[in-house]
Design a protein with these regions (language model features):
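Residues at the N-termini of beta-strands
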Residues: 1, 85, 184, 204-205
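Zn2+-dependent cytidine deaminase-like catalytic core
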Residues: 1-28, 142-144, 157, 196-198
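Conserved functional loop/turn residues at catalytic and ligand-binding sites
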Residues: 15, 181, 201
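Short beta->alpha connector loops at strand-helix junctions that form conserved
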Residues: 22, 161-162, 210
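Conserved beta-strand edge residues that scaffold enzyme active sites
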Residues: 25, 165, 191-192, 212
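Active-site ligand-binding patch in enzyme domains
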Residues: 34-36, 40-53, 57-183, 192-195
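Flexible, gly/pro- and Lys/Arg-enriched active-site loops
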Residues: 199-212
């Protein structure tokens, strides 16, 4: 948006032939995050969904951490590395206690995406592994000063975005991430948050891992 075609004009004025629109579809796919942020004022959103063959996202005892095998988990971590932000919900953090770090072959990467936690009522435990590595942003519907302070002491940033029914405004959250120049968001959340994002039309791509 800072250039807005002026670069092409400058090249032409310098006597350089410039063709535009070549391989437009392929170029858009390569830059889907940036293009979505420029045209829709939000990042490209990719949601990971792991399910059993019969369509469930958790076991009968409520466990959801290891539905899929190591190959699927390693593939999912690859997408974490490509993202500008990893988005999850408080239910997932409380149930699975994930670190949600970007790793390749088990090695922690030097560049860690921003980790974003949707937690409407600040129920998260500051001792969760979520806060162990990288920058973290906790998004609530209404800030509680005491709870917020405990999270800030763990290095987290707090953002209050009130939506309907006392929940976080997810559309406003994506606009805020776009303002922070996040091009791609990788969602690793439970059925509630992922389903709500799909319902609102905020998911551009689904990564479905199905375990027999």
């Amino acid at each position: 948006p800072l250039v807005a075609g002026r670069g092409v004009e400058m090249l032409r004025q310098a006597g350089i032939t410039v063709d535009v629109g070549l391989l437009q579809k392929e170029a858009w796919q390569m830059n889907a995050g940036f293009m979505t942020r420029m045209t829709e004022n939000r990042p490209w959103v990719r949601a990971k969904v792991a399910m059993s063959l019969d369509g469930f996202t958790a076991l009968t005892n409520g466990e959801s951490q290891w539905i899929t095998g190591p190959e699927a988990r390693e593939d999912g971590r690859r997408y974490r590395c490509e993202a500008g932000a990893i988005l999850t919900g408080v239910g997932t953090v409380l149930a699975d206690n994930p670190s949600l770090t970007a790793r390749v072959d088990g090695k922690l990467q030097s560049r860690q995406p921003l980790k974003v936690l949707v937690d409407s009522h600040l129920r998260v435990n500051p001792e969760n592994h979520f806060f162990d590595e990288g920058q973290t942003l906790v998004v609530c519907a209404k800030e509680d000063l005491e709870k917020s302070q405990r999270l800030r002491e763990k290095g987290a940033k707090i953002l209050s975005l009130s939506g309907e029914n006392g929940r976080v405004d997810l559309q406003a959250l994506l606009k805020e991430l776009a303002r922070r120049e996040v091009n791609e968001v990788h969602v690793e959340a439970g059925a509630t948050l992922t389903g709500e994002m799909v319902r609102l039309g905020l998911v551009d791509e689904l990564l479905c891992y199905i375990a027999p």
